[in-house]
Regions:
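Beta1/beta-strand and adjacent pyrophosphate-binding region of the FAD-binding site
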Residues: 13-27, 181-191
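N-terminal Rossmann-like FAD-binding beta1-loop-alpha1 element of flavoenzymes
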Residues: 19-46, 194-203
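Glycine-rich dinucleotide-binding loop and its adjacent helix/turn
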Residues: 5, 61, 152-207, 239, ...
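Glycine-rich FAD pyrophosphate-binding loop
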Residues: 22, 38-56, 206-217
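Extreme N-terminal leader/targeting segments of oxidoreductases
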Residues: 1-21, 39-42
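Glycine-rich active-site loop/strand segments that organize a redox cofactor
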Residues: 65-100
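A conserved FAD-binding loop/helix module that cradles the flavin
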Residues: 35-36, 221-228, 324-332
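A Rossmann-like FAD-binding core segment of flavoenzymes
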Residues: 2-7, 88, 122-125, 129-138, ...
């Protein structure tokens, strides 16, 4: 083919694609990738079905840090009295903390949206699924978008093992939005998410029990860290039940509960233990949001926990087993 013929065919090749990069997921990874790609001259579209910011901003790192900050005031009040301060008995108001969290999340979400707009990224509020290696369908309006490259940055969701009454429990996705403060909290699991919530709710005034399947908390962490955390939590009055797991949740007789499952819940463990809780937080780890995206229809292989099986690549960006479809992986 002559040079002039090659140049003449180039526009038709470019016309095959509506965008250079289509990002599925508006969390930290997707937002960053979209902005950087656009900054290098790529035409970028990003689809998010919920809120911009993803787990970290909306229901993870940011609200958790705000709650931890609030929980530390209880120690400050106690210490102030030892240094001469005379205070009336402090009263903690849960709805005020939730409202403050909502304001900050809304502010940050607005900044994310403004940043994408300023970078020239087109943001679409819709769930997106793959139809082939270069085509994405937007479920909100049925529109199809052709993309040179597709980046999957859909994050993860809580892992929920099957047991009776699991619908009465809550996960880390909803714990920041409870309408009433749980005076008695049972937590299933003893990983870092479970232990973070155990500590902050205990500091806010909850009676906390952690049901741990293993012989210690924080599996996978250094042994000295595990021992230190377990000892510190025990000294703070947090009850740790080792070698056990939740078997069943039941609503107490005559207690209809509320919209966020508020109300007394009977907890039965595998070892025959019985607990009563206002809320049961299920923190058994997380699994990737890769199901129902259309990956398997393309021939992409998913692992046992629904992760995309990929080739090695730097910077936590991996090729899937389908060419042109890329996943942003996460260490959390």
């Amino acid at each position: 083919m002559s040079t002039s013929a090659a140049k003449a065919s180039a526009p038709s090749r470019e016309a095959e694609f509506d965008v250079d990069l289509f990002v599925i997921g508006g969390g930290s990874g997707g937002i960053r990738a979209a902005r950087v790609a656009s900054g290098h001259g790529a035409k970028v579209m990003l689809a998010e079905e919920y809120r911009l910011g993803g787990t970290c901003v909306i229901r993870g790192c940011v609200p958790k840090k705000l709650f931890v900050y609030a929980s530390r005031f209880s120690d400050t009040f106690d210490e102030a009295a030892e240094f001469g301060w005379r205070l009336s008995v402090p009263h903690f108001d849960w709805p005020s903390l939730v409202a403050a969290k909502d304001r900050e999340i809304t502010r940050l979400e607005g900044l994310y949206g403004t940043g994408q707009e300023g970078a020239g990224v087109e943001v679409v509020r819709s769930r997106a699924v793959l139809e082939d290696a270069h085509t994405v369908r937007l479920l909100e309006d049925g529109r199809r978008v052709r993309a040179r490259t597709i980046l999957i940055a859909t994050g993860a969701r809580p892992e929920l093992p099957p047991f009776d009454g699991i619908e009465l429990g809550i996960t880390s996705d909803g714990v920041f939005d409870l309408k009433t403060f749980p005076r008695k909290l049972v937590i299933g699991g003893a990983g870092y998410i479970a232990m973070e919530f155990a500590g902050l709710f205990a500091a806010l005034g909850s009676d906390v029990t952690v049901v741990c399947r293993g012989s210690n908390v924080l599996r996978g962490f250094d042994e000295d860290v595990r021992q230190a955390v377990a000892g510190s939590y025990t000294n703070r009055g947090i009850k740790l039940m080792f070698g056990d797991s939740i078997r069943r949740l039941e609503r107490r007789d005559g207690d209809v509960g509320g919209g966020d499952h508020a109300g007394r819940i009977d907890v039965t463990t595998e070892q025959g233990g019985r607990l009563v809780a206002d809320q049961v937080l299920l923190a058994f780890g997380r699994r990737p949001n890769t199901t129902s995206l259309g990956l398997t229809a393309l021939g992409s292989r998913l692992g046992r926990t629904a992760q995309s099986l990929s080739t090695r690549a730097p910077a936590r960006i991996s090729r899937t087993s389908t060419p042109w479809v890329t996943c942003r992986t996460s260490s959390t």
